[in-house]
């Protein structure tokens, strides 16, 4: 990345009030900052204000750490409840992918990374089965096998090993690419806002296992997929992206699975891109995508 492309991204939220935009803008302008992208939104139901701003890094006489230090006083002025993050696009994004046996989402992500459609470093793929080890290693990416067993102690040990492997990578994103294990509450909390799941239904419909079978039994005319952040409540985390495709009376369960996999790949790629570009602002169980 050239110096001309480097940007600092400010994501900010607080209870809405007069003068928020003016205060942040004047803070940046007084320091010589050049805002090249800005977006704002107020949720009228909750009274919460959201903004995302991109500032040219070379327009400021100091770096990201100093920007964060100086912004603390601005955030305090705008309210004790203010929630904010400042990221630096020069910092390479790192990603770990968790998989089981189904490979369509992994294949798609690896292809998008290899073609530079997704600007991220995949530092590891971790699977509870070995079926996807070869394709991972063919892309020059380490594959780690963490088998899960049925007994409670064995599962706890497996999740402990999984946590150590993931945390060692210091990832910005942890993608559950059809990883068919339910994360314990402790990991959900530790990875909050970083762990993304792709669920093969248009949530909140057909939560849990075998959603295509559920959809076929219900006789739906649309099926979909949902990319969401992982929480302790199964398939109930903040939704980042969704999409649907039409199905017909003649479609079998296998047809639904085939059509659904296409949607899963697209929805996961979109949601992941927005996450990596710091375009997602979280508030409770809701997201704002700028």
Model region roles, listed by residue range:
Residues 128-129, 154, 172-290:
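Donor/substrate-binding cores of folate-linked one-carbon enzymes
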Residues 103-114:
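Histidine-anchored nucleotide/phosphate-binding helix
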Residues 137, 141-169:
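Adenosine-nucleotide cofactor-binding segment
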Residues 120-131:
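Short internal beta-strands
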Residues 1-93:
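A conserved regulatory-domain signal marking ACT and ACT-like small-molecule sensing domains
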Residues 95-104:
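Short, glycine-rich nucleotide/cofactor-binding loops
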Residues 14, 99, 126-127:
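Short beta-strand/turn micro-motifs composed of small residues
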Residues 121-123, 142-148, 194-199:
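Short hydrophobic/aromatic-enriched beta-strand-loop microsegments
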């Amino acid at each position: 990345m050239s110096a001309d492309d480097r940007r600092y991204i400010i994501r900010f939220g607080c209870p809405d009030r007069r003068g928020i935009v003016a205060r942040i803008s004047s803070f940046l302008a007084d320091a010589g900052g050049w805002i090249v992208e800005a977006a704002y939104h107020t949720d009228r139901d909750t009274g919460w204000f959201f903004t995302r701003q991109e500032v040219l890094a070379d327009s400021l006489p100091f770096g990201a750490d100093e920007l964060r230090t100086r912004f603390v006083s601005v955030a305090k002025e705008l309210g004790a409840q203010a929630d904010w993050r400042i990221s630096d696009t020069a910092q390479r994004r790192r990603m770990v992918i968790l998989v089981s046996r189904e490979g369509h989402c992994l294949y798609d992500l690896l292809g998008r990374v290899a073609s530079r459609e997704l600007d991220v470093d995949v530092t590891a793929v971790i699977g509870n089965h070995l079926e996807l080890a070869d394709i991972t290693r063919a892309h020059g990416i380490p594959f780690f096998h963490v088998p899960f067993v049925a007994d409670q102690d064995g599962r706890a040990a497996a999740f402990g090993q999984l946590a150590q492997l993931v945390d060692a990578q210091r990832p910005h994103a942890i993608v559950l690419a059809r990883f068919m294990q339910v994360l314990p509450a402790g990991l959900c909390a530790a990875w909050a806002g970083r762990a993304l799941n792709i669920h093969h239904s248009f949530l909140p419909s057909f939560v849990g296992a075998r959603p295509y079978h559920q959809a076929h039994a219900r006789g739906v005319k649309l099926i979909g997929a949902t990319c969401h952040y992982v929480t302790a409540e199964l398939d109930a985390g903040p939704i980042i992206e969704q999409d649907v495709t039409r199905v017909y009376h003649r479609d079998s369960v296998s047809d639904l699975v085939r059509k659904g996999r296409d949607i899963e790949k697209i929805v996961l790629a979109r949601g992941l891109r927005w996450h990596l570009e710091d375009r997602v602002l979280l508030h409770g169980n809701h997201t704002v995508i700028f």
